[in-house]
């Protein structure tokens, strides 16, 4: 049986009831923040990813819960939202909702460039600006290394022109890690985005240490391992020692592991429900696990 996060929350397994008693608006300054190495600008360590639930929005009923998520996200101190042209309606939804809520200036918008060829890349960037309803995008990263050398050249030109602020590359596939590492060594990048989870620690072998050496910001995708982690802990309660790092749910257990890595700037879990938003942002509050506790978390998950 495949358990998902909703079922775990309904069952109350490993979830402190206190997370549902948090005020709708928590102090913005309570979120843990990390600095972007290239500029010193700080970001909350938990953001929002939009790859699935924002990708097939067709009606007002689809939009309404997402609008409430973004409204409360900003009110609770969040600002990093990650999207991509390949995520269906996601860029348009994010742009429209940000405009309606008048929160664009409060957001750090990140999107991706997944075209081949210079002209196609420029066209896609122009489309992203239009969809996001913004004259400038905070971060654009070459998506899964697609035509990376060509597109990074275009992105640098746009950065110099003030149309984007940060440049990077992304992957969510282990098979690309070697090429990813080579690109990190060859190019000056503000950010990388890579897959990393408590049950998928391969990026910690070479990519994350290299990011530290290169002074590159790190955004983490797939922090729940495509849902595998929630399935792995089905029927299990949080270990008592999770309280030592202010962890109240399995989602926080998984996210606090990620953002306690000293090289990680932020993680962007997919978030389309307010209850998940409140839970996820709990990972950006309180204590984080120390190195020894991180090893203990790894042993715990590996032993399931």
What is each of the regions a protein language model found here?
Residues 47-52, 83-85, 111-113, 141-144, ...:
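A cross-domain feature marking catalytic cores of carbohydrate-active enzymes
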Residues 1-107:
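N-terminal binding-site loop/beta-alpha segment at the start of enzyme catalytic domains
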Residues 15-16, 20, 206-304:
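Structured C-terminal cap/extension of enzyme domains
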Residues 106-108, 189-194, 287-293:
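Short hydrophobic/aromatic-enriched beta-strand-loop microsegments
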Residues 33, 70, 91, 95, ...:
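Generic structural signal for well-ordered alpha-helices
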Residues 73, 102, 159, 211-212:
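A generic structural signal for well-ordered alpha-helical segments
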Residues 57, 116-193, 197-202, 206, ...:
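Glycine/proline-rich, positively charged
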Residues 36, 48, 81, 94, ...:
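Conserved, mostly hydrophobic/aromatic
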């Amino acid at each position: 049986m495949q358990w998902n996060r909703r079922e775990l929350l309904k069952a109350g397994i490993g979830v402190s009831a206190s997370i549902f008693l948090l005020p709708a608006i928590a102090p913005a300054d309570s979120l843990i923040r990390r600095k972007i190495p290239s500029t010193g600008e700080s970001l909350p360590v938990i953001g929002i990813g939009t790859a699935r639930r924002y990708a097939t929005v067709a009606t007002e009923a689809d939009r309404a819960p997402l609008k409430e998520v973004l409204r409360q996200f900003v009110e609770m101190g969040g600002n990093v939202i990650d999207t991509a042209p390949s995520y269906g309606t996601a860029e348009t939804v994010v742009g429209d909702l940000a405009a309606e809520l008048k929160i664009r200036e409060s957001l750090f918008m990140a999107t991706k460039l997944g075209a081949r060829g210079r002209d196609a890349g420029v066209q896609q960037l122009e489309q992203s600006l239009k969809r996001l309803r913004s004259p400038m995008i905070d971060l654009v990263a070459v998506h899964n290394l697609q035509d990376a050398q060509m597109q990074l050249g275009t992105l640098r030109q746009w950065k110099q022109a003030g149309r984007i602020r940060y440049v990077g590359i992304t992957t969510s596939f282990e098979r690309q890690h070697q090429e990813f590492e080579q690109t990190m060594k060859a190019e000056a990048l503000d950010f990388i985005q890579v897959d990393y989870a408590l049950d998928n620690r391969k990026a910690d072998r070479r990519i994350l240490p290299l990011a530290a050496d290169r002074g590159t910001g790190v955004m983490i995708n797939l922090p729940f391992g495509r849902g595998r982690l929630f399935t792995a802990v089905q029927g299990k309660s949080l270990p008592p020692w999770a309280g030592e790092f202010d962890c109240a749910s399995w989602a926080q257990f998984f996210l606090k592991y990620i953002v306690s890595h000293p090289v990680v700037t932020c993680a962007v879990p997919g978030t389309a429900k307010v209850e998940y938003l409140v839970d996820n942002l709990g990972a950006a509050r309180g204590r984080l696990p120390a190195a020894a506790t991180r090893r203990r978390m790894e042993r715990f998950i590996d032993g399931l």
